[in-house]
């Protein structure tokens, strides 16, 4: 039994408008619109009653159970995205590490011999504060997380000095260096 799929999704009709089509679901809110594509022959039914969305399965096959939880989570994330939005914060730790935004490009200097230029995807806003704090925000949870991961991959945090691109609340478990074990 899918626990996530059985959750009802509560809607605020003043803020969110759902439109169900044969091949997609459109979620419209104050921050924008998200369209979720639906696979053909989806074994789910969507019922909207009294500002609550209930998703039910047509059968008990394994594939139906998988879709049940997945689409419940995707619709919930779309509703949160168009009403509140999503945000990820990154911080740059290291000597000379800095970032700035020029138009649609995020420029990073992470200790390489050349600057790194990351194109900012449509639908995202990137702000840089104090040259070392990057805030990525948008209505799509997937897109925000994916871009944050792309930026982070350029210089993953290392455990000896703690340098790199870190999520704002991330804690790096530090390792002792070679000299910490004792000299012979």
Swiss-Prot record:
GO molecular function: rRNA binding; structural constituent of ribosome
UniProt-listed Pfam families: Ribosomal_L6 (PF00347)
Top-rank taxon: Bacteria
PROSITE patterns found in the cross-reference section: RIBOSOMAL_L6_1 (PS00525)
Keywords: Ribonucleoprotein, Ribosomal protein, RNA-binding, rRNA-binding
Recorded GO CC terms: cytosolic large ribosomal subunit
GO terms (BP aspect): cytoplasmic translation
Gene3D superfamilies: Ribosomal protein L6, alpha-beta domain
Cited function: This protein binds to the 23S rRNA, and is important in its secondary structure. It is located near the subunit interface in the base of the L7/L12 stalk, and near the tRNA binding site of the peptidyltransferase center.
Binding partners and assembly: Part of the 50S ribosomal subunit.
Family, similarity comment: Belongs to the universal ribosomal protein uL6 family.
Protein name (database record): Large ribosomal subunit protein uL6
Organism: Mycoplasma pneumoniae (strain ATCC 29342 / M129 / Subtype 1) (Mycoplasmoides pneumoniae)
Lineage: Bacteria, Bacillati, Mycoplasmatota, Mycoplasmoidales, Mycoplasmoidaceae
């Amino acid at each position: 039994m899918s626990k996530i799929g059985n959750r009802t999704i509560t809607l605020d009709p003043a803020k969110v408008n759902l439109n169900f089509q044969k091949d997609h679901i459109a979620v419209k809110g104050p921050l924008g619109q998200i369209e979720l594509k639906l696979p053909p022959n989806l074994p789910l039914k969507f019922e909207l009653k009294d500002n609550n969305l209930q998703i039910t399965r047509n059968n008990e096959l394994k594939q139906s159970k998988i879709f049940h939880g997945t689409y419940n989570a995707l619709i919930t994330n779309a509703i949160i995205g168009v009403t509140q939005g999503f945000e990820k914060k990154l911080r740059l730790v290291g000597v000379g590490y800095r970032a700035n935004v020029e138009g649609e490009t995020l420029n990073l200097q992470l200790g390489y011999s050349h600057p790194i230029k990351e194109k900012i995807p449509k639908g995202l806003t990137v702000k840089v504060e104090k040259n070392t704090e990057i805030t990525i925000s948008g209505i799509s949870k997937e897109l925000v997380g994916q871009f944050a991961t792309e930026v982070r991959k350029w210089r993953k945090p290392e455990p000896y000095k703690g340098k790199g691109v870190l999520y704002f609340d991330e804690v790096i478990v530090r390792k002792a260096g070679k000299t910490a074990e004792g000299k012979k």
